[in-house]
């Protein structure tokens, strides 16, 4: 089956050819917030309260967050933060500790990382070092930061495994109120008691622990206390959490920049971590985009001070104001698009004189009938040799070594990152490849650092994946499931037609957008179309939903249901549980409408004359719900595969 061909259309208009994204100005994306307002709206009372203007007329509804659209990427690259020479000293220091840990009666060996006069930069160094080396303590003496072995880590590593101890200390350092960490099952009550006592003694003011039984095995969970439930006495930890409760909201305008690239630069300028920024969704690179953001631990005044530095990198900030909490993924109604399609031409049947009529028919068809709600090419990455869904398939099979090889498969280009990938595949030398890998490739560098430390076998590759943020690991699994969904949608329309048929799935009650399979999903919420309902045409095609594979979804009860089983078996996943336990990944699945419709769609056809010829361009504006793709909508309008 062709991987990238989304050629199944639902309208029969002729369509036309044209080019998109000739420049960022031709592709403008404006986020629509949960109140139906553009996030770049201007209000004279902005400093007092959030903007209340520019309500949309259409019927976009808040949709279920699709966390796979968001490639959240924490950047703890010590080469960037400390410098190459200091980081090498630190790695040498940690290697010596691994070989010969300090005993209790030995004097603690320390290493100086240098002086950092800026307190925000000191916070970055503390967090980055502890993330990369959880077994180290970081100490500040005036402006100097020193590191030494953490005896608490060694104690916990003696009670649990070293890997669990690392994950636990990262969990503690993240300081996310209400978050939970679960130790591996432990049948020894005496041993569990020791773990309880350790956590209570060392972190009792921050966390609470309890044991629970899961599949006849007992586990310990640790929950970070909510802020209101912590002891009232102010401690250093309380002060730090109070500082971290400072939030500033703003709108980011960026041009020709990845969302994560923009965040990494802003974090470096402000002296915070990329993980201190939150947003509702990832936006296109080759575009001008406006999106809401919230940054932690930075005041509005400090953010505004850095505005000129951001502008030098193609970013502008506006609507800067205090906020009470971080922004959650999926917290938007959708996106507004202002697009220009250039170099318009017919597919071949008519002359240019007929172009206005052809365009009008195409736009009206999609306005009334919608388009097949395929996942767009952004979902699968930009690679031509290996795409994200292939990595996801290897992870679902728990073939860690194969997944890492796919992850590092280079493109045909000869730039630095592909040279580094090529070197790793040819030599297996993670350390040398790390030196070659550009500093801005944070994911690859995190993976290489872990492979250098733990080796490139099955266990080392597992640790390599665990070095990446959870959202990045699960992205690859969701990419595979999205590929299957796209192919299922094409099969459904080609084999079963353009009307609901017996066995199709619909919502028992009206629901907009994606619905996660774990969100209180009971059987009555999913309705299976009956023979009588098919005969009486009770439902329309835009009510049909298709499951994205997972362990909590119901499959159609017709040919399409069997197709899903055959398709998964084709990839060796006939008994897949859609859980990758070593990587702490779970894919419940979700339900996605087969069709989507643009709202508030307008267009205008323009002609520009030159000495040689007349050229036509189409300006097209519309709104889409979250998780819908403008390029897919354009593909239906133009009758062209833009993937």
UniProtKB/Swiss-Prot annotation:
Domain TRUD, chain residue ranges per copy: 370-597
Broadest EC class assigned to this enzyme: isomerase
InterPro entries: PsdUridine_synth_cat_dom_sf, PsdUridine_synth_TruD, PsdUridine_synth_TruD_insert, PUS7L_N, R3H_PUS7L, TruD_catalytic
Protein name: Pseudouridylate synthase PUS7L
Family label: Belongs to the pseudouridine synthase TruD family.
Listed Pfam families: PUS7L_N (PF23943), R3H_PUS7L (PF25094), TruD (PF01142)
The protein's role, per its UniProt record: Pseudouridine synthase that catalyzes pseudouridylation of mRNAs.
CDD domains attached to this UniProt entry: PseudoU_synth_ScPUS7
Keywords: Isomerase, mRNA processing
NCBIfam families: tRNA_TruD_broad (TIGR00094)
Organism: Danio rerio (Zebrafish)
